[in-house]
Amino acid sequence: ASFSEAPPGNPKAGEKIFKTKCAQCHTVEKGAGHKQGPNLNGLFGRQSGTTAGYSYSAANKNKAVVWEENTLYDYLLNPXKYIPGTKMVFPGLXKPQERADLIAYLKEATA
């Protein structure tokens, strides 16, 4: 199923998901710097593997996907399947509602 078929995302619920499942490796604030994973500020409309100052896997650079709702929705289901060879060890979010919520949060928090 694609993002267009996903339930409406709730940014508040998405923030909770981010804090419990993503924040140990990612920051969203402008200028917050990188952790184990890259800072996600300015994520929407950016090509994978291009955040300045972060050392990406060749897989992330070579995928050359532009991050937006549809690509994030597919990626967050199973990151290692979407970008084989990615350094991101996160297993993914199986529930469409959780992915929609996280994307709604990221759209606000990374802008």
Swiss-Prot record:
Binds 1 heme c group covalently per subunit. One of its GO terms (biological process) is mitochondrial electron transport, ubiquinol to cytochrome c. Its main location: mitochondrion. SUPFAM superfamilies: Cytochrome c (SSF46626). Disulfide bonds: none annotated. Keywords: Electron transport, Heme, Iron, Metal-binding, Mitochondrion, Respiratory chain, Transport. The keyword Heme applies. It holds the Pfam family Cytochrom_C. Heme c binds at C22, C25, H26, M88. One of its GO terms (molecular function) is heme binding. One of its GO terms (cellular component) is mitochondrial intermembrane space. InterPro entries: Cyt_c-like_dom (IPR009056), Cyt_c-like_dom_sf (IPR036909), Cyt_c_1A/1B (IPR002327). It is found in: Mitochondrion intermembrane space. Electron carrier protein. The oxidized form of the cytochrome c heme group can accept an electron from the heme group of the cytochrome c1 subunit of cytochrome reductase. Cytochrome c then transfers this electron to the cytochrome oxidase complex, the final protein carrier in the mitochondrial electron-transport chain. Belongs to the cytochrome c family. This is Cytochrome c.
